[in-house]
C-alpha cells in the first residue's frame, strides 16, 4: 500500500543522521488527487513530511509520449533538495513562475509552453501546508475541492505553489522498433508450448467465488 510505503521511506530518512542531498520519488499521477473523500491529502502529507525533514520539493506529472517516447504513461515525479544544497538556496531566491517554467530541473529538461500572463498570482495556486502531520491528515481539503495539486509545483518551508503546464516538444517522435534488440533473442525469453496455457490462465480474467 502506498501509505505504508511512504512511512517506510519517511522513517529511513528520519533516522539518517546525514540526510541524502537529493531525493527522487515516482508514483502514479493519481497520488495528487487521492483519497477520493479528501482529494490531495496523501500528497499534502508527503510534502509536509519532507518539509519537516528539511527538504524543498518540486514535482511534475510527465507523460513520456508527450516528449517523443513510444509509451503513453503518466507518472508524477517528485524531487527533493536538502537544505544544505545549492539548489535549495536557489529555489528560495527564485520566483515561483520562473522556477516552474524556466529555472527548475523539470522546466529545463522537460520544456513547457510559456504562459502569457502579467502577474504570477493570476496563474499560480498558493497552498499553505501545515507542519503538523496530524492536522494535515484530519483537515486538509475537507471541502474536497477537485485537483488542489496541479501537474506541476514546488514547495519550500511549507509554502506551496502549483499550476498546470502544457508540454512543449518539437523533436523527432521515437518508434518502438528503435528500442528493440536487433540481435537474436535467447531461447530463455520464449514461452514454450507446454507453458503457454499456464501463462494464458495467469494473465487472463478470473471469476471471484
Model-derived regions: residue spans:
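Class I S-adenosyl-L-methionine
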Residues: 1-209
Amino acid at each position: 500500500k502506498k501509505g505504508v510505503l511512504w512511512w517506510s521511506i519517511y522513517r529511513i530518512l528520519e533516522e539518517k543522521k546525514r540526510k541524502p542531498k537529493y531525493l527522487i520519488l515516482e508514483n502514479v499521477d493519481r497520488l495528487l488527487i487521492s483519497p477520493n473523500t479528501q482529494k490531495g491529502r496523501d500528497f499534502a502529507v508527503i510534502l509536509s513530511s519532507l518539509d519537516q525533514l528539511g527538504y524543498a520539493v518540486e514535482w511534475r506529472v510527465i507523460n513520456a509520449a508527450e516528449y517523443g517516447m513510444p509509451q503513453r504513461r503518466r507518472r508524477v515525479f517528485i524531487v527533493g533538495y536538502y537544505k544544505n544544497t545549492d539548489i535549495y538556496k536557489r529555489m528560495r531566491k527564485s520566483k515561483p513562475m520562473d522556477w516552474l517554467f524556466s529555472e527548475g530541473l523539470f522546466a529545463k529538461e522537460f520544456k513547457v509552453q510559456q504562459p502569457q500572463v502579467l502577474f504570477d498570482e493570476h496563474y499560480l495556486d498558493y497552498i499553505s501546508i501545515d507542519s503538523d502531520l496530524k492536522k494535515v491528515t484530519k483537515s486538509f481539503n475537507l471541502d474536497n475541492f477537485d485537483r488542489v495539486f496541479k501537474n506541476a509545483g514546488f514547495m519550500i518551508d511549507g509554502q506551496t505553489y502549483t499550476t498546470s503546464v502544457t508540454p512543449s516538444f518539437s523533436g523527432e517522435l521515437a518508434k518502438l522498433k528503435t528500442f528493440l534488440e536487433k540481435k537474436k533473442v535467447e531461447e530463455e525469453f520464449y514461452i514454450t508450448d507446454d507453458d503457454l496455457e499456464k501463462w494464458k490462465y495467469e494473465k487472463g480474467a478470473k471469476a471471484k467465488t
